[in-house]
Every structure is written in structure tokens, then in C-alpha cells.
Amino acid sequence: MKKLQKYLMILGTIMLSSGISACSKQPDFDVKSYVQSSLDAYYHGEYKDYANLLEISEKDAKKEIEEDFNESIQQQFDDSDNITDKGIADYTEKLTEVKKLAKYKVQDVKEEDGGYTVSVQVEPSNVFQTLQQSSTEVSNEKIKQGLDGNDPEVFASVLTESVQKSLEKNSYGKTVTVKVSVEKDNSGKYGLSDTEMSKLEAAMFPTE
């Protein structure tokens, strides 16, 4: 089950490939709406406001975020023959459920040094903190059933069932406030960088 531990360890990093696009160059750029709609689109699958800000269709916004997310997961298995395509698809579906656990509230915005600092109130989920225990429980169940953990279908079921078990016992910790920067990129558009998204991700889904 060493391979299983490897994928569980990188679970928290998979979701950091945000695919959040930079937004307006305009002076009337609504930072709060941008951050709120970006998080709503990425975590909760609510694309309308995000699409409006980017001036694209909801369909394109959904495609952009889902493709980036799916690709980030697929890359983790590129060097593995230990899981089927269906297994990866099932696993991706479970991680989409994990994303929906995200609890956040965009609060104050301060303009600083040509960019913006945004305060986001976050309730930490313990879904990744319980994953190790969940995987141990599921693995032991499979062993008792006489199943081979190296079998691709068994391996996939252990991954998805481990995530499901942690989803079912999810709880939230004390609210924390995270400050993120919204800055201009090379094209002059404002956006949340992967580094800033990582700050939020680490607060919403701590692994330790």
C-alpha cells in the first residue's frame, strides 16, 4: 500500500492548481466580487458571476476550471499503471465533493502598492486530516476480504472509499482570517496567483 500513501500525501496539493483566470484591467475593477466569484466557481461550481466578470460564457468558465482540475489529477497518475481510467474518474468526482466543503467569506479589501489585500474568513475542514486514518480502515477491510491492493480496481476503490469515509465524518474548526493579494500580472490584469490560492487552500483544508 505504499503507492496508496503516496497519493494520499499529494492529495492536498492536487487542488492547488486553481485555474483561476486574471480579470479586468479597468480602474473600476471590483476586487471583492472577483475573489468571491472566483472561489464560488472553483469550489462550489457556481460560474455565473465569475463568467460575467471575465466576459465569457458560463459554459466556457466551467470548462476552463474543470479541465485544469482534471488535468492536475491526471498528472498525478501519469507514471502509474496501478489505476484504471474509471478509477481516476471516480476519484476526481470524490475530490469535487471535497471542494464543495469549502467555507469562506470575503471581507475587507485594502488597496496597497498598486494591488489589493483581501481578507477572507475561513472555516477549516478536517477532511484531509482524517484521510490517513480513513485509508487505514479501508485498506484493512480490503485485506480482510482477501483482496489485492495492487489490483488496479481495488487500488481505485481504496482511494475513493477513503475520501468518502473522510467526507462523511467531516467537521470544521475555529474560523481563521487569511489575507491574500490580488495583483496585476504581466498583461496588466488583476488576479489571484496560485501562491495566494494556496494560502486559502491550506487554511480551508489543512493536512496536519
What spans do the regions from the language model cover?
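Short amphipathic beta-strand and strand-loop transition segments with alternating hydrophobic
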Residues: K100-E111
